[in-house]
Amino acid sequence: MERVRGACQSPILILLAIVLPFPSTSGPAIHPLIESLAARIRQRRAQLPELSPFALDSVMESISGQLDGEELLISNELHRCRGMRKLHLEIARLGGGLQVLHCVFFPDPRFDLPIFGADIVAGPAGISAAIVDLSPVGLTMPEALLHGLESLPIPAFQQVRELPEWGSIFSPFVQFIRPASSQEESWFVDLADGYLKALISSVIDATPDASDAASTIQRHKSQLSYCIQQKRNDKTRGVLEKAFNPQWADRYIEEILFEDPPPL
C-alpha cells in the first residue's frame, strides 16, 4: 500500500457537485466514478424517512461562472429528513478538465447521528482523490452504527492519501484514497454505499433528545466546530472568489456548503 503525500485538493470540500445535467456538451462526459457514486447516493437518500426538499434560493440551484477563461458549472440538490437537517449533493465541472462530486449529510443535533461526507476529484488524468467518512458529533459513535462500520470489509487500496492538517474532524473510519484502477473505483463506491446503509439504518431507528438536553447541546457544539473547520479551506474560497466574487463566495460557503446548525 502506497501512502500518497501532497496537498489535499478536496477532501470533503473544494468545489461542489451536481445532480442536474450540465448545460454544456463541449467537455468530456462525467467521470464514471462520479456518476456511479452520485447514483448510489440518490438511491440510498430515497430510503430516508420523511424525505423532503430543503429550501434553496433558485439562484443557487444551477450556477455558471468563468475561471481562468473556462466555464465553471455548478448545480445543487438539497433535502432534509427526520433526523438529518440537511442532505447536500453537488457536482461541478470546470471546462473540459476538473470535475468534483461533493456530498455532506448533516444530522439534526437532537439525534445521535454522525455527519456523512464524500468527495471525489477527477481531472484529465483520472481520479486524484476520493474520500468518505462518517464523522461523529456526539462524544462517541452510536454503538449500533459502530458495529455496522466495524463489520464492513475495507478494500486493499494501493494509494492511501494523508489527511489535511484539519483532519481531526474525521473518524477512524475515514478512507482517503487515490483509486489505482477501475476495480478500486468500484470498491470505493461499494464502501461508501456500506457507510450509507449503516447510517440509514441508524436514522430510521433514532429517537430525538430534548433540545435543551446536555447531549443535544454537545452535538450542536461539535457540529458547529465541524463546519468552522471546513470553512478554513482557503482553496475552496479562493476558487469561488476568483470565479464569482468574495461576497458571493462567502454566501455560498456559509449558506450552501457548510451552513452552521441553527440555534437550539
UniProtKB/Swiss-Prot annotation:
The keyword Ligase does not apply. One of its GO terms (biological process) is phytochromobilin biosynthetic process. GO terms for molecular function: cobalt ion binding; phycocyanobilin:ferredoxin oxidoreductase activity. InterPro entries: Ferredoxin-dep_bilin_Rdtase, Ferredoxin_bilin_OxRdtase. It catalyses: (2R,3Z)-phycocyanobilin + 4 oxidized [2Fe-2S]-[ferredoxin] = biliverdin IXalpha + 4 reduced [2Fe-2S]-[ferredoxin] + 4 H(+). The keyword Oxidoreductase applies. Its EC number is 1.3.7.5. Keywords: Oxidoreductase. It is an enzyme of class 1 (oxidoreductase). Catalyzes the four-electron reduction of biliverdin IX-alpha (2-electron reduction at both the A and D rings); the reaction proceeds via an isolatable 2-electron intermediate, 181,182-dihydrobiliverdin. NCBIfam families: PRK02816.1. Belongs to the HY2 family. This is Phycocyanobilin:ferredoxin oxidoreductase. It comes from Prochlorococcus marinus (strain MIT 9313).
